[in-house]
């Protein structure tokens, strides 16, 4: 075979006739190839190249067919067309050995007639393939796998279903789109490869939790006021409320203390005589509500409409003072002087 190719190349240098190769052959599958081994049959079936007789090589060299040799295959009965390369010139005379998938694509059976013509195809720049089974999703790096498997093909034709072998199983791909033409050569070219979702794949709908825009209401202010009084006033004595001055009053002139009651303030500006006693059980702060419907992918930072404790205490004092109608004083009653009137 190498001698034939050398003779053909020599004929091209000397100047052979230029034309299109066009022949008719009887087509058979790889199992009909004489002395075919199982590895040889798999090599043919999982590729895009055919076997032609040795006489075809002589004609191809005489016609000065450029390399790589590409062919257009036509089933004249149903007018189906595809394209391929050539693997060897070892087929029986008058016969062409085609991969099984190519015979199915053209609607051919063993013993049918096929027309084979030489073809010139542009280099591929883009190819989109659609996996025909969900097993494709188990491939870790599909582009790397196809980069190796597509080396067994010389060209691609739109709407062809090409098989590849991966991990002992057959994966089929439908050629969905090609650029710059519907039939392209994929030998020694850079192809941008893309994939459609596999056949039978159903994408699960995504559940999106709406974002929280309004601020939730803050707990009652009395919870914080009571907590502050308990924390600041207990001091380890066990008392819930404190007095500014404790004990009985004494006069410097020895007289007894007047019977009028003196109301004291508890330090907050509110009279203890009118203030309600603080309960032992303070109102609890409302528990934090956990968003059990939270889905990963969105983090919500909630800002409660809180106010500082000193601001709340000031507002509470002003509110109590407005209810009493007059500002509160620590000491009430008439004033006294230690000196006699002049």
Swiss-Prot record:
Record's keyword annotation contains Membrane: no
Against Gene3D superfamilies, the record matches this protein to: 3.10.330.10, Ubiquitin fusion degradation protein UFD1, N-terminal domain
Concerning its family, UniProt says: Belongs to the UFD1 family.
Major localisation: cytoplasm
**What if the gene is knocked out?**
RNAi-mediated knockdown causes embryonic lethality. In embryos, DNA replication is partially impaired causing a delay in S phase progression in P0, AB and P1 cells; simultaneous RNAi-mediated knockdown of DNA replication checkpoint kinases chk-1 or atl-1 suppresses the delay in S phase. Prevents DNA replication licensing factor cdt-1 down-regulation and causes cdt-1 accumulation on mitotic chromosomes.
**InterPro entries registered for this protein in UniProt:** Ufd1-like, Ufd1-like_Nn, UFD1_N1, UFD1_N2
The species this protein was found in = Caenorhabditis elegans
| GO CC terms, sorted | nucleus; VCP-NPL4-UFD1 AAA ATPase complex
Subunit structure, as described in the record: Forms a complex composed of ubxn-3, ufd-1, npl-4.1 and cdc-48.1; within the complex interacts with cdc-48.1. Interacts with cdc-48.2. Interacts with npl-4.1 and/or npl-4.2.
Subcellular location(s) per record = Cytoplasm; Nucleus
Where does this protein have compositionally biased stretches of type Polar residues? 259-275
Any GO MF annotation of the entry: protein-containing complex binding
Function field = Functions at a post-ubiquitination step in the ubiquitin fusion degradation (UFD) pathway. In association with npl-4.1 and/or npl-4.2 and ATPase cdc-48.1 and/or cdc-48.2, involved in the cytoplasmic elimination of misfolded proteins exported from the ER. This pathway, known as ERAD, prevents the activation of the unfolded protein response (UPR) caused by the accumulation of misfolded proteins in the ER.
Gene responsible for this protein: ufd-1
Descriptive protein name: Ubiquitin fusion degradation protein 1 homolog
Q: Which of UniProt's keywords are assigned here?
A: Cytoplasm, Nucleus, Ubl conjugation pathway
Q: Where is this region: Disordered?
A: 245-276, 318-342
């Amino acid at each position: 075979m190498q001698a034939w190719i050398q003779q053909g190349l020599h004929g091209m240098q000397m100047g052979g006739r230029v034309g299109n190769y066009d022949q008719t052959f009887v087509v058979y599958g790889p199992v009909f190839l004489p002395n075919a081994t199982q590895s040889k049959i798999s090599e043919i079936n999982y590729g895009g190249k055919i076997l032609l007789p040795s006489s075809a090589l002589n004609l191809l060299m005489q016609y000065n067919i450029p390399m790589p040799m590409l062919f257009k295959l036509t089933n004249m009965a149903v007018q189906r067309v595809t394209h391929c390369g050539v693997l060897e010139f070892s087929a029986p005379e008058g016969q062409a050995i085609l991969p099984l998938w190519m015979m199915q694509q053209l609607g051919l059976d063993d013993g049918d007639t096929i027309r084979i013509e030489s073809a010139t195809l542009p280099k591929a720049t883009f190819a989109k393939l659609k996996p025909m089974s969900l097993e494709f999703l188990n491939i870790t790096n599909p582009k790397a796998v196809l980069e190796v498997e597509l080396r067994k093909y010389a060209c691609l034709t739109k709407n062809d279903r090409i098989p590849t072998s991966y991990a002992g199983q057959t994966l089929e791909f439908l050629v969905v789109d090609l650029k710059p033409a519907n039939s392209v050569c994929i030998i020694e070219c850079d192809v941008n490869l893309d994939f459609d979702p596999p056949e039978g794949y159903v994408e699960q709908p995504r559940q999106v939790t709406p974002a929280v825009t309004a601020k939730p209401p803050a707990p009652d202010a009395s919870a914080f006021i009571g907590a502050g009084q308990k924390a600041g006033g207990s001091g380890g004595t066990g008392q819930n409320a404190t007095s500014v001055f404790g004990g009985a009053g004494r006069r410097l002139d020895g007289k007894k203390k007047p019977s009028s009651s003196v109301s004291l303030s508890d330090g907050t500006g509110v009279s203890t005589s009118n203030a309600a006693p603080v309960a032992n059980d303070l109102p609890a702060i409302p528990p934090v509500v956990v968003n059990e419907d939270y889905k990963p992918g969105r983090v919500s930072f909630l800002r409660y409409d809180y106010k500082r404790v000193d601001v709340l205490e000031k507002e509470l004092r002003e509110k109590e003072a407005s209810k009493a109608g007059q500002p509160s004083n620590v000491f009430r009653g008439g004033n006294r002087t230690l000196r006699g009137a002049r």
